[in-house]
């Protein structure tokens, strides 16, 4: 059996596309992802750790999230918000 590919990522979860786009704008302007996660994320587990999700396999997350996260270059973040059943995500690899 082959090794399962895993990815380390962070995310910021918000309730609107507009808010997610605002966060992406702040990142484009040089804001630190971890700081924005602490300020904005609706994910309680991400508030105190900069949105850190640790390592996960593609099958551990909903497809919309995994597809976007696994497509990122290391250190990059999504330039468009990612919609899932939980809300809108900004993801950083």
Task: Go through each PLM region and give its residues.
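Peptidyl-prolyl cis-trans isomerase
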Residues: 23-64
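Short N-terminal micro-motifs specific to bacterial/archaeal maturation
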Residues: 3, 11-14, 27, 56
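Solvent-exposed coil/turn segments that connect beta secondary-structure elements
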Residues: 12-19, 42-43, 58-61, 93
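Short, amphipathic alpha-helical interaction segments embedded in low-complexity terminal/linker regions
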Residues: 14-18, 35-36, 75
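Solvent-exposed, amphipathic alpha-helical segments
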Residues: 19-26, 68, 72
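Proteostasis/folding factors centered on peptidyl-prolyl cis-trans isomerases
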Residues: 1-11, 39-40, 64-93
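Short glycine-enriched loop/turn motifs at secondary-structure junctions
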Residues: 5-7, 18, 47
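Residues at structural and domain junctions
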Residues: 9, 22-23, 55, 73
């Amino acid at each position: 059996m082959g090794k399962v590919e895993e990815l380390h990522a962070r995310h910021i979860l918000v309730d609107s596309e507009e808010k997610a786009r605002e966060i992406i704008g702040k990142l484009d302007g040089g804001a630190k992802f971890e700081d924005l996660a602490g300020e904005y994320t609706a994910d309680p587990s991400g508030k105190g750790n900069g949105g850190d999700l640790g390592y996960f396999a593609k099958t551990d997350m909903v497809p919309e999230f995994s597809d976007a996260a696994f497509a990122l270059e290391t250190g990059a973040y999504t330039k468009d918000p990612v919609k899932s059943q939980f809300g809108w995500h900004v993801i950083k690899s």
